[in-house]
Amino acid sequence: MDKRNFIKTLGALSFSPIISASEFSKNHSLSNNLPKIDNVDELWKTVRSHYTLKDDYINLESGYYNIIPEPVLDHFIKHVKHVNVEGSYYMRNDLNKNKQRVTKELAKLVGSTPDQIAITRNATESLDLVISGFPWQKGDEAIYAKQDYGTMKEMFEQISDRYGVINKIISVPNHPKSDEEIVSLYESQITKKTKLIMVCHMINITGQILPIKKICEMAHSHGVEVMVDGAHCVGMFDFSIDDLNCDYYGSSLHKWLATPLGAGLLYVNKNKTHKIWPLLANGITDKTDIRRLNHIGTHPVHTDLAISNSIDYLNWIGIKRKEERMRFLQRYWSDKLRNTNNVVVNTPEDINRSCGIGNVGLTNMSPSEMAKTLMDKYKIFTVAIDYANVKGCRISPNIFTTTDELDRFVDAVKKMAT
């Protein structure tokens, strides 16, 4: 089925001004409209046809925001129109029912339960909500890494100024020898005053995946809670939040789940919900109800609705198949560059320590100059990283990326390295 007919088929779904939440769900599902494709090569060709891409450069920077595939985008536009037609009727009658439905679908995707999942606007909101709402006392200690995301580190700095919390900062090696090396690094900073550890599931600047379950087991043995930054994980690779055994987890869904901008996930272990103060006050008096943590007032509800379509699209591909593809794309270019003179791959070589994101630098060129040269001379878009012992460009291809495009990237880096 070609792209035009595929989108046309999706557009044939019925639409009426006022329908029930259950009818809305049925009529706005992708589940019955995506073609069954068993051949892997044909699948990825079909997937690429679902994206409208600029032809004046190669996009290897999907890590910030993941372009929405057209089948999902088509449904997102339908949601916008539907909510616009119903207006206040939708907000008063169907908003909460649909949000509960989408939350249930999201919980299933990440291997948890709806009573532990809240829809937010991004990972920053999810994690900063926990950091700012944690019951800190003066002299409490928190642990995080130099490689963690900036806005969360800034929130820890703010609670240090506000409550007198002591922040202890470690540096995660780019090429750890074992899980135990990472676990011991965090454990070395724990004292009797340590209350919370923040740790990346995947470090956003290098793509390194950390041994979260082992870190949580270690921390809990000391009575310390763990908050996980999984901004790049939901929709990229297969995992279960419940299996990680963490206390808190945050992710951005507009990254690798490819929802519209402004969708995130917050997980709070049901035994910890009562202790976190909401970002904004609300009327929910039950402190064990996670819904009290994601009250943000009126917001673009059609974005929340499109989460369901993004889940449908991911399930059509298959999360394990997507994980395999993402890891293949990253290893395709990184393995070709690892033993090249003047080239430094900042992502672990161990196949289990990374997935789709990688980082590569040049000893003869600064990261900013490297990114500029890649774009200006070779028409390849990346992002420069030059902090926390990481010097290079983050390379984040997508499921629409071809090996021909990665060959052009590898060739460009080799030429720049000489």
Where is each model-derived feature located?
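Pyridoxal 5′-phosphate
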Residues: 2-418
